[in-house]
Structure formats: C-alpha cells, structure tokens
Amino acid sequence: MTDARNVAAWRTPQGTTVPGNRWDLLDGVDAAAVSVSVVVPYYRQQNQLSMVLAALERQDFPRDRLEVIVADDGSPEPPQVECGIPVTVVTQEDRGFRAAAARNLGAAAATGDVLCFLDADTVPEPGYVRALVRLPSLIPDALTVGRRRHADLTALGRLPEPGDPLLDEPGWLLDAYERSRDLLDADDRSYRHVISAVMCCRRTFFDEVGGFDESFTSYGGEDWELANRAWLAGAVLAHVPTAVAWHDGPDWAGRPDDRRRDAKNGEAMALAPLVTDPAARRHGVRYAVPDVTAVVHSEGHTAASLMVTVGSILRHGDVTVWVDGAEASSFVGTWGIDDPRVRVGSPTAADTARSRFAVEVGGRAVFGETAFELLAG
C-alpha cells in the first residue's frame, strides 16, 4: 500500500491533480470559485420540478454563480419555471424515454464551469450544490455522486423533517460506499455506484469523455456507462455523503417485482455491448468492444511465430488482436483463419477507448495461461 506521506496533490493550470483516486488529499481544502449549471432532465413532472426549483433557491451556494437548465424530454406542455435563479428551458422532440439525450441537450446549453446533474423528482437539501461541486471545482477530472435518499415528497409537500416517515435507501449501495470508503478505494467495478440523478463533474471533463451515450432509450444504464468511460479516461471518483437530495418515491428495490426485473434486464442488455467488465457480460456471447485490445507488431516474426504470439493472446477470452506492420496482411493471410477477433492494421483511439486494457507486443512473445489475469489485477 502507498504511504500517504509519500504522495501529494499538485497544482496545474487546469486545477489540482491527485495521484490515483486520492481525493482525500484535498480534505479540508475550500472549493475554488466556479460557476455551476444544474441540469435537470424533465418529462411531465411539474409538481416535482417546482419543489426542485424552490429547493435550488434555498441553496447556500452563491446565486450569482448558479444557473438551472431544464432539459425537457418532449413534454406535451412546457414546464413552468418560476425561480429566483436564472433558468433556461431546452426541449427535444418526444421520441420516447431519452434522458441521456436530454442531459446532453441541457449540458450543451449550460454556461457553468461545473455541471451538476439533478433529476426532476429529486429535491436537494440546502448544502447540496456546495458539497457536491467542491471536488470538481478543484480537480478537473473529478466525478462526484451525492447521497440520494427516499421519501414520499408528494404526500409531504416538502423535504422530510424529523419524525416523518422515510423510505429505505438501497442497502447494496450503502454497503458499497462503506466498503470503498466513499469510493476512495474505487476500482473497475465502481462505475455501478455512480448515479446520474445526483452526479457532478467539470464541463470540460464531460465534453472530453463524450457526454452521455444517447443509444440508451429506456430507464437506467446511461449513468453506469458514462461512469465506466470516465473511469477508463482517468476520472477521480468520489461519493459525497453530505450532498443529500431526496427522491420522491422508493428506490427500484422498493417497486413491484415485475417492473423492477424487466427494467434491470433491459439495462443489462444495453450495458453489455459497451461496458467490458466481465460481470456485465455473463451470457457467453461476443461483443464488438473487447475487454482487451492488443496490438502485435509483425516485425521480427515469421508467419508461424506470429501465429503463436497471437494465439497465446486469444486464449484469454474477451480480446481483439490487431496485427500491424509491413508483412501483417501477408502473414495473417497464410493462416487460413476466419476469426473476427484478429484484424490487420492499427486500432484508432475509438477502437480502444472502451476497452479496460490495451496491450502492445513486439517480438516473439508467448503469453502464459494466467498472464492477462495478472494484468487485470
């Protein structure tokens, strides 16, 4: 384990950089002065939106550095947005559930340095924005997630007070935050603990990773996919338990079994082609995006030795091997194979962006049976 005394944060023109996921090195450091855009995806939720806007008016964050973008997913009537904070409404055509596209539309209209995503049915406590934006204000690649609690806000008509009935928080998520020390000990599976309903990052980092994937057109999954892509791009993940917002109604675990099962099955199907985590790919089928992208240089090989090297990589499962070099095509052509995992040429950045691991191989290497398991840690 790294000794904390031997690591430190350091300043760059873009902000503070920390080694690994060590956001704890900035404990006690005040936020930088940034402007914040709260992006609220919305569809026919006027009463809930009104509660959200009223709660945003009560934030202890400076109003002159705060704006709200309501991203309407094609509601029949436009939302009413009476608020003491500047509010912009952007609208897209109603083509079904497109929360990912709505969030991107809202982000595109935002002018703030930091994007704070907040669902229209999730009402923040007064310190929410201040707490959630602190790390992104300091670390340019921070991705923070707040604490989403649950209550029947429609019945209460306000945020809960002591003695009010509450709904359960998802135990699996609370356990994950406890085990990981609020994601300080994040790993390749921590994307599952980032929720777009209470999520925050720098505008520049959001643009760098490409925003939400708009192929998601049903409930759930787009936040996990974005968090996975951000992690692969070097994001610093942090759960901020003091950034509390209240969801109006139960978590999915508290909803009818059939609805929950159908939604989770659809989410899993949408994630598997894009997230290469083996736990997200349990059905034995192969996807276009591999977990490992390997580049093997043909220089110094014969056709036979090249095949031995490539074959030793392919035995490791979810792998695509690119063979490059002047003789790559002729060598591979002699093998007589019909294997879509083997390609001739060099991968583009887009080809490798979603893979967890990239391997470059020169010379006549032969990989043992456990080599890639060791690589994956």
Where are the model-predicted features located?
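N-proximal low-complexity "stem/linker" segments adjacent to membrane-targeting elements
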Residues: M1-A55, A270-A304
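Acidic donor-binding segment of Leloir-type glycosyltransferases
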Residues: A55-E93, L314-R343
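Short, flexible, basic/aromatic active-site loop/helix in glycosyltransferases
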Residues: G163-Y191
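Conserved nucleotide-sugar donor-binding
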Residues: T111-G112, I195-V209, R354-S355
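Glycine-rich, basic loop-to-helix element that forms the pyrophosphate-binding segment
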Residues: Q92-A110, R343-A350
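Short aromatic/hydrophobic "clamp" motif used to bind/position activated sugar donors
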Residues: L115, A358
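Conserved donor NDP-sugar-binding/catalytic core segment of glycosyltransferases
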Residues: G127-E169, A365-G377
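Acidic donor-binding loop at a coil-to-helix junction in glycosyltransferase catalytic cores
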Residues: Y219-E225
